[in-house]
Amino acid sequence: MEVSFSAPPPPDAASAAAAAPSLVPAVSAAAVAATTVSCSPQPPTGSPSADDRILVSVEVLLHATSTARAEDVCAAVERMLEARSLSYVDGPVPIPNDDPFLLANVKRIQICDTDEWTENHKVLLFWQVRPVVHVFQLSEDGPGEEPGEDDTLSSFNEWALPAKEFDGLWESLLYEVGLKQRLLRYAASALLFTEKGVDPCLVSWNRIVLLHGPPGTGKTSLCKALAQKLSIRFKSRYSMCQLIEVNAHSLFSKWFSESGKLVAKLFQKIQEMVEEESNLVFVLIDEVESLAAARQAAISGSEPSDSIRVVNALLTQMDKLKSWPNVIILTTSNITTAIDIAFVDRADIKAYVGPPTLQARYEILRSCLQELLRVGILTHTQGGNSLCLLSYFSLMENQHCPEVADPHGSVHLSGLLHKAAEICEGLSGRTLRKLPFLAHASVANPSCCDASAFLHALIQTAQRELSESRG
């Protein structure tokens, strides 16, 4: 099985051509020349064999109107990659103008999974890599609701994956290094163990993920993005992928003992979906503590006794789903201590999602400013060149260079952004993405906002937001 793991964005082929290519020239002059000429790559003596090469995912998004076979597109992309002696870096790959087949059918080509190497300042050269191409189209159907009984709240929302609503969500989420890769690898291992027929009596795994942490850290978004990413990676194995977002509040009845029955009915519908072997189903239970409230609290009298039946029904139904190989349960919680210990014990991965680190805060704010520059809300040109804010690692490497003295240079402006990120310690990712809007609203002349003035306003806004959050 060829499974690889992920990273970054781009909206379409046009922006991909304008963006920095994710396949960048190798360090040598010969490799630089190779970027403009198709050639047969010649790996150096002693290069790794095919089995030892690093798997790197290449995600290929087709146009909504494309009717090309995935196999044909995959072969065309592989030929395109083989014809170029390049190093691999996360990001968009420009579609060659001399390939009418790809131009007509492909909206975007994206290199993924190299972030762990770039974090360690390593370069992946073409002869070290084995690309794994994933071809997909986005569903534009939107969410569907499963109506509850007697005009009550719908019991769940359903998405066909990969969905247009979640496109780019994975790349926009920034956490400590390794968290997203860990979740991807877990899911790949869980499906592999099932596919190979590993005896669950000897090796136990439940295909249950629990993300916990304070509100606003992106736990629910990460679950949706993970389901989207896995639906792309396993598209060749499962012809259909679905995300079922459970509305936990709809499962509580005003009638005594009815709540447990509602949980059983919901999971019966989910079981009908997973009975189709070609269907991969992700079940998302947000704020699972509302369902899995501790039975001990109910026994002590601080929780209604009906909650015992709800917890028992939830655990029983989850155990039933374990026998089906094509379902993964994703759960989130803001209050881990309120969850029944029997539920926590069933989760294979219990990952804490805390407030973003300094690096994550910087990259979140940088992505916001890049978007404002892209649409023209912020303006900045120095010497005819548009502003290019440095990545976190590039800034760390260049913070003592002479260009820091230039108040309009990229290094100086990136330093101001870094100062804002330092001030924002303790703020959630949700709050961080609001700051650029609040900063723009505080600028004296918002219709013509210079990047330098905006960054100073952003620092003031961050200080004000932090003081307000601390009371």
Swiss-Prot record:
UniProt record, GO biological process: meiotic recombination checkpoint signaling; reciprocal meiotic recombination
One GO cellular component, as annotated: chromosome
Residues holding ATP: 213-220
SMART domains according to UniProt: AAA
Keyword Phosphoprotein: no
Statement: the UniProt record of this protein carries the keyword Nucleotide-binding: yes
Keyword list, A-Z: ATP-binding, Meiosis, Nucleotide-binding
Gene Ontology terms for molecular function: ATP binding; ATP hydrolysis activity
InterPro entries: AAA+_ATPase, ATPase_AAA_core, ATPase_AAA_CS, ClpA/B, P-loop_NTPase, Pch2-like
Cited PANTHER family: PACHYTENE CHECKPOINT PROTEIN 2, PACHYTENE CHECKPOINT PROTEIN 2 HOMOLOG
Family, per entry: Belongs to the AAA ATPase family. PCH2 subfamily.
Record function comment: Plays a key role in chromosome recombination during meiosis.
UniProt name for this protein: Pachytene checkpoint protein 2 homolog
